[in-house]
Amino acid sequence: MQDIEFLYLTRADVIATGVDMQMVMDAVEDSFRLHHAGQTNLPWKTVLDLGERERGRGNAMPAYVGGEYDVFGIKWIAGFPKNPVLHGLPRATGFFVLNDSWKGIPLAIMDCTWLSAMRTGAVTGVGAKYLARMDSESVAMIGAGVQARTQLEALKVALPGLQQVRVYDIRRETAETYATEMAEKLSMEVRAVDNAELAVRDADVVVTVTVADEPIVKDAWMKPGSFFSAVGSYQEEEF
């Protein structure tokens, strides 16, 4: 019987492929179109709780995408919010398994930490491309972790006119680090502020990327006509 060979890609391998945010956004937009056309199968994800909500959980997320892609697979990803502080590890870690849709054989097993963050950012980017005002100039970013980086990267692709970012995080030093890093990476004005309201007031685009279980953003702070993307386990705006 023929041996089955497949690619194994580490996080470094995945990054080294040269995939950038525009490419990820294009793939996400294609997937949305295929989903609308009924050419996907996207079961509910399975959440594996570990008995203590604050500890973390595992998520199994299978899917099939047809069209020119015609592949199926699963993302197995663990979310442990305290990892960065307690262990110096990413909050989310896991891998993808990608399968041939005609033979069922695995095509690749690859780290999903980086690409999953890119994909989540790309969803906001695609949404902003069609729903945000194209003359948007300012962003409020609530949260300054890994996901906040890819969110802003995708927004800059979708809305090239963005110039200013106000970021708030419960840890001021985290927000300051984010501001320095992203200002240099995207050639934008990025500054940390002392609270969520200062970030949100008058912002053209608002993104929440936290795991808070209480509302953070209030409707009264929102600028009319602004674009709002709530990323995470909870709805973080209070109407």
What are the residue ranges of the model-derived segments?
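Short acidic low-complexity segments
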Residues: 186-203, 219-220
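Short glycine-/small-residue-rich Rossmann-like dinucleotide-binding loops
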Residues: 210-212, 232-233
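Short helix-loop-beta connector
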Residues: 131-138, 161, 223-224
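NAD(P)-binding Rossmann-fold cofactor-contacting core
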Residues: 158-183
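N-terminal Rossmann-fold NAD(P) dinucleotide-binding loop
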Residues: 148-149
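Glycine-rich Rossmann-fold phosphate-binding loop(s) that bind the pyrophosphate
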Residues: 144-145
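N-terminal ligand-binding/catalytic initiation module
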Residues: 1-117, 125, 132-135
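Rossmann-fold NAD(P)-binding glycine/threonine-rich loop
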Residues: 222-223, 231-239
